[in-house]
Structure formats: C-alpha cells, structure tokens
Amino acid sequence: MPVPIRDALTFDDVLLVPKRSSVHSRKDVDLSTKLSKNIKLNIPIVSANMDTVTESSMAISMAHNGGIGIIHRFMSMEHQVEEVLKVKRSESVIIEEPYTIWPSATMADAKRLMQEKGVSGLLVVDANKKLVGIITARDLLFEENDLSRVSDLMTPMKSLHTARANTSIDEARQLLRKYKVEKLPLVDDEGHLHGLITSKDMVTIAESPQACKDSKGQLLVGAAVGIKEGYLERARALVDAGADALVVDVAHGHSDRVLNVIQKLKKELSQVDVIAGNVATPEGTKDLIAAGADAVKVGIGSGSICITRIVTGAGVPQLTAVLECAEAAEASKVPIIADGGIRNSGDITKALAVGASSVMIGSMLAGTEESPGVTVMRNGRKYKLHRGMA
C-alpha cells in the first residue's frame, strides 16, 4: 500500500519573522527552562553524551554556565562513576566526603591520590575517621624520599583551624577570612571528620550565580546508560555517585526494549529523572512518556556527522520532528530536547520556537578545550577529533 508523502522542514528551511520587542537589554532576558520534569536549567543548552564531547570537564563548564552535561557511556562503569564524582566534587558548599589518607601512607601514596583525584590536598584521618592532620601539595614540594610517611609531612591537628559540623556558610566564610586558610575541615566534638569547606568553592560560587546546582549546592550532571545487560547495575552506581538524570542512550528509542528499560529504571530509581530517546514522531513521544520518561530526546539522523539516515533511510526533518513531538508532549508537560541538527545559534532559536525546552549540542562544542577529543595538528593548526555515535 503506498504511503502518502507529506512536506516536512528542517532548520535551514525556515526563518523567524521579526516582531516588536519590549526588551531593553539582553540582560533582561530569562532563558531558564526545564531539562526534564524536575530539573531546571538556567540556559537551554545540554552537551551531548558523546565520547568526544562530554566528560567531567565539559559537564563542569556546562553546569557553571547554567546548562548541563551528560557523561557518555562509552567507558567502564567505574570510569563513568568517577567522572560523575568529579563533577559533584568540583564545587560544593560543603564537601560531605572529602578525600582522605591514613597517617601511615607514604608520600608516593599521597602524590598518586592527589593526581588521581585532581586535588591539591588530603585530610589525614585515623582508623576511627578522626581528623589528625592535613597534607597538601606544598608539603611535598621539596621532599625527595617517596617513602616518607604522611604523618611526618602533614600539618598536625593541633595546628589546624577547624569548624563545627553544623557551621553555616556565612560562619565558614568568616573563619576562612579570619584565619587566612584555604581549607576548613568540619568536625564534631570528638574530632570525627564530617566534611570540608574550601575558599576556592566560596569564590567560585560567588563568581557563578547562574550555575545549575542540586539541593546540596553541587553542580548538576547527567549520565547516559544503554539497554544491554548490566544497564541497571550501571544506573544504580551512577545514581549513588550523584547523577541527577539518567539518559537512555540509543539510536532508535521507539522500541519495546527501550520502553521496558524506562519502566524498570523508574521503578528501581524513582528519585532521578529519566530522559529517553531518540524518537522523531508523535507516536514515539507518547509511548516514551507513557512508559515513564521525564523528558524526551527528539532527533533521528539529524546530527552533523550522523549517518543513520544514509544507512537506514529512516528519519524526519528535524524542525518538523521537534514541532510534532512537542505538540504530542504538551498535555503531559514533559519537556522535549532537540537533539541534532544544531549547527549555529539561529538553529537553537528555531528549535525553541517550535516547542523544544532545550537543545543538545555536540559538534559545536567538540572543538573546545573542555571536550575530551584528541587534539591533532594539521598544517600548523590545532583540531580536535570528533565522531558520531548511537
């Protein structure tokens, strides 16, 4: 039976008609939006879950600027968990579980842990988790013996400035200023370690009022999972690490297997939002929402380096896909993420105009310093490798 052919549009096919504006300054424009049912963003930008686009560095930068990054899944579960932890630890009003080391550890152990975790200092605790000192990179600068004990190099507890476990942020700021220290450990009356506040985080918080954070003051971050065996174990580990959203990452999201995965994730991990995709039709959107999706990613083969349409012959021009899927999701108030086909800022505007709550960007961010892509030199110029994936 012949299938009727209808007109459909992509971003380059349309322009927005200029109209009268009452905005006096770009600073007056509110770009806040919903990533998903329960997650608010201050700008409608999401960095793509691609291995040449988003790992912890990109996710940190995105959240600082009001968006969010989705850590890709093309790495071991342990590595992905560590990337999420890096984002969560990068900025926090209170670091609830600061990195620690034992007094009996060696200088080599301290150096290795600092480098591995990307920190400049470690709190030294005993077997009962009582704070006994602090060791920083400065303590190791001129020490040549890698077998020297941390207990011999650290600043001991008697020389440290600490604060109560329930110290407020304002009190902590005053103590940091008063004692001119960079790190303020939080301890109880018996000396047990309960957290850490740093001057670096205080400064960063003041400089980034638009940053997207969770209820603990940590930066927001999402993480991608697949649908093959082991996805649930990975999802649990990511949520335990602090991931605020899980993205079910497959090329064709309108499938029974994806619907089953969404239902399972919502049942087992109801505390986090599940973003599902990708789809390009109203029917696909409605089915994902019915399965429990808190946001729907729209876009089949529309990415700048995606070959899905070439290989399979399947897809819908992106502007039409976003428009129709947004209409299908309107009644349920589930946000739509336009994923793919965004080649310039004008495309972002068009996607938002037809109903997307946010846009997912890959190629536009792939050449930045924050992306994990490999840097290569061509004819005296720097480039970063970028590739598509499903």
Q: At which residue positions do the language-model features occur?
A:
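Short beta-strand/loop segments at the ligand-binding rim of alpha/beta enzyme cores
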Residues: 40-46, 93-98, 214-224, 265-280, ...
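Bateman/CBS regulatory modules and CBS-like beta-alpha motifs in cytosolic regions of diverse proteins
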Residues: 25-42, 48-50, 79-117, 124-126, ...
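Catalytic cores of alpha/beta
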Residues: 57-60, 233-241, 274, 280-298, ...
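Active-site-adjacent beta->alpha loops and helix N-cap segments on the catalytic face
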Residues: 27, 76-85, 143-147, 192-212, ...
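Short beta->alpha transition motifs characteristic of CBS
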Residues: 72-76, 119, 123, 130-146, ...
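Alpha/beta catalytic cores of nucleotide-metabolism and tRNA/nucleoside-modifying enzymes
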Residues: 1-20, 24, 101-102, 163-164, ...
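Glycine-rich phosphate-binding active-site loops on the catalytic face of alpha/beta enzymes
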Residues: 64-79, 243-255, 294-312, 342-375
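Catalytic beta/alpha-barrel core
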Residues: 71-74, 100-101, 121-123, 162-163, ...
